[in-house]
Amino acid sequence: MQVILLDKVANLGSLGDQVNVKAGYARNFLVPQGKAVPATKKNVEFFEARRAELEAKLAGVLAAAEARATKINELVSVTIASKAGDEGKLFGSIGTRDIADAVTAAGVEVAKSEVRLPNGVLRTTGDHEVHFQVHSDVFAKLNVIVVPEA
């Protein structure tokens, strides 16, 4: 099925590309999320008329994401208190939701889906480097310090 991409899609293309994808992928993912439209003659003409507007919108979203990434990088570190045993092993773990809530409380709005934990959830006290994927092209790093609760 031929579709016109309205957004950058990983491993597929960027704004304005006409690509051939499986019908189910287009019908169930790309079209409902507003990332593509079927490549009919009418849609091609409509897209060409709105191309500049869509590119400006995409640039605005990218600029906002870069601003948020800069704010995350400026935080340097966030401290999270959790119950822990004598050897620094946590009772439970600290996951993406806990980290997102702590960063949001520190003043930068972050969704839990933007938190990337390459080594899995945090299960020990100490310093941990956490990555954030704010946009498909924009990444940020933050140091999360896990301290035992008193």
From Swiss-Prot:
The lineage of its organism: Bacteria, Pseudomonadati, Pseudomonadota, Gammaproteobacteria, Enterobacterales. Belongs to the bacterial ribosomal protein bL9 family. One of its GO terms (biological process) is translation. Signal peptide: none annotated. One of its GO terms (cellular component) is ribosome. One of its GO terms (molecular function) is rRNA binding. Keywords: Ribonucleoprotein, Ribosomal protein, RNA-binding, rRNA-binding. The gene is rplI. Gene3D superfamilies: Ribosomal protein L9, C-terminal domain (3.10.430.100), Ribosomal protein L9, N-terminal domain (3.40.5.10). Binds to the 23S rRNA. It comes from Yersinia enterocolitica serotype O:8 / biotype 1B (strain NCTC 13174 / 8081). Pfam families: Ribosomal_L9_C, Ribosomal_L9_N. This is Large ribosomal subunit protein bL9.
